[in-house]
Amino acid sequence: MQQRRPVRRALLSVSDKAGIIEFAQALSARGVELLSTGGTARLLAEKGLAVTEVSDYTGFPEMMDGRVKTLHPKVHGGILGRRGQDDAIMEQHHIAPIDMVVVNLYPFAETVAREGCSLEDAVENIDIGGPTMVRSAAKNHKDVAIVVKSSDYDAIIKEMDANEGSLTLDTRFDLAIKAFEHTAAYDSMIANYFGSMVPAYHGESKEAAGRFPRTLNLNFIKKQDMRYGENSHQQAAFYIEENVKEASVATAQQVQGKALSYNNIADTDAALECVKEFNEPACVIVKHANPCGVAVSTTILDAYDRAYKTDPTSAFGGIIAFNRELDAETAQAIISRQFVEVIIAPSATEDALKITAAKQNVRVLTCGQWAQRVPGLDFKRVNGGLLVQDRDLGMVSEAELRVVSKRQPTEQELRDALFCWKVAKFVKSNAIVYAKENMTIGIGAGQMSRVYSAKIAGIKAADEGLEVKGSAMASDAFFPFRDGIDAAAAVGVSCVIQPGGSIRDDEVIAAADEHGIAMIFTDMRHFRH
């Protein structure tokens, strides 16, 4: 039999009150004595529950505006006391055992995320007594249950009912792990916040705070184990951030199909992030982390049809992302035309899911609609270190563009230029994208020489019989030589959009003028490695 411990006395002190009333009522109904502090105690008393204030229990009042509430031997002795070993000393000092501690911590992350949060506000939201109780209870998990997540309330009551008011050691150990994870994440947030302020605090920077802390503490939660990683000899798992607000592959719900692989997740992320760039109904098809077809139209069906035409060969076994609900007609077009690994969309109709269900290997994910892009950090692991940078959310508006050629772009060329510029951001460098009438017609990705990416994009368009004449070309970075412009002109490109900034910009612009090409500078680069 598991080492059960009956729950006779519980201390409840929570910042997040979700579910606490019902949980406290369930504990009380099972004969558990309730201790509590401050606002939690008042809330429970208002609901008619018999609750003892910790200050009454210890005989010592809360003080210093609530900074000192639970830091008392009667509290921590009751939590840390080892049953069967410390009984005599506990009895001598009138310390009653506390069998369960229910605590979640001051909302530090929410506080510092608020605009205008001062250092004083942040400091006052650093919990002291809470983490101390959490760690004490987790340390003594052989005798005490520590509860830090409201999502565990129902399971705890269910287990108590199955074990005559007791919890097993396995459960207490699992709860202790969650508790240490909780306090580690909490302390990491505080360390990151203060670490980012070190230069400014010591007068080493004119900025209010640095973007990157002195020590970077990261906390991710394992969502799933993978069968293997990028290759079959590599073990892997998928970890996600807690409380992600933006629709993403990490928050998406899989509504159909077998488990996602490591490569599925990476490619789905690439497809979804690309399709988010567009306001019109859009489709992005990705293969090996690169878009192989992108289009916008009046419907996602037409957008898919046009994206597929860019490169049907590469689309086989690809990932398809939409920025509108997946409907039955589009689902049918996909299933009848190609093999697809993953389809991701904000939502999917029931009829669409019935159609995709006919193909058991097709994974369908719904991620919800996204209102806005959320700034964050990108990470790249190198041997012995971690490169950290802001997410590339850089965008350019039509008003920010600079036409540097003699010829001005037509309205259609300008639309196509802005369209393929958005796509180029998600193509591996060196990236070249040809587009015409809101669809990609050729994509050159990942070449060591930019001119070869331009040539490949032209070859891809020719292979599919797509008309390049009058198209726009986007380059993720500047052209170091005029050869890329010459290659584009040779296949009929009439407009080029690029960041500019080369020491040979004059030569490159002159090449555009020679060929009658309109050239636009964005003054923003989008390397992707």
From Swiss-Prot:
<dbReference type="InterPro" id="IPR002695">
    <property type="entry name" value="PurH-like"/>
</dbReference>
<dbReference type="GO" id="GO:0003937">
    <property type="term" value="F:IMP cyclohydrolase activity"/>
</dbReference>
<feature type="domain" description="MGS-like">
    <location>
        <begin position="1"/>
        <end position="148"/>
    </location>
</feature>
<keyword id="KW-0658">Purine biosynthesis</keyword>
<keyword id="KW-0378">Hydrolase</keyword>
<dbReference type="GO" id="GO:0004643">
    <property type="term" value="F:phosphoribosylaminoimidazolecarboxamide formyltransferase activity"/>
</dbReference>
<protein>
    <recommendedName>
        <fullName>Bifunctional purine biosynthesis protein PurH</fullName>
        <ecNumber>2.1.2.3</ecNumber>
        <ecNumber>3.5.4.10</ecNumber>
    </recommendedName>
</protein>
<dbReference type="GO" id="GO:0005829">
    <property type="term" value="C:cytosol"/>
</dbReference>
<dbReference type="GO" id="GO:0006189">
    <property type="term" value="P:'de novo' IMP biosynthetic process"/>
</dbReference>
<dbReference type="InterPro" id="IPR024051">
    <property type="entry name" value="AICAR_Tfase_dup_dom_sf"/>
</dbReference>
<comment type="similarity">
    <text>Belongs to the PurH family.</text>
</comment>
<dbReference type="InterPro" id="IPR036914">
    <property type="entry name" value="MGS-like_dom_sf"/>
</dbReference>
<dbReference type="InterPro" id="IPR011607">
    <property type="entry name" value="MGS-like_dom"/>
</dbReference>
<keyword id="KW-0511">Multifunctional enzyme</keyword>
<dbReference type="Pfam" id="PF01808">
    <property type="entry name" value="AICARFT_IMPCHas"/>
</dbReference>
<comment type="pathway">
    <text>Purine metabolism; IMP biosynthesis via de novo pathway; 5-formamido-1-(5-phospho-D-ribosyl)imidazole-4-carboxamide from 5-amino-1-(5-phospho-D-ribosyl)imidazole-4-carboxamide (10-formyl THF route): step 1/1.</text>
</comment>
<keyword id="KW-0808">Transferase</keyword>
<comment type="pathway">
    <text>Purine metabolism; IMP biosynthesis via de novo pathway; IMP from 5-formamido-1-(5-phospho-D-ribosyl)imidazole-4-carboxamide: step 1/1.</text>
</comment>
<dbReference type="Pfam" id="PF02142">
    <property type="entry name" value="MGS"/>
</dbReference>
<dbReference type="InterPro" id="IPR016193">
    <property type="entry name" value="Cytidine_deaminase-like"/>
</dbReference>
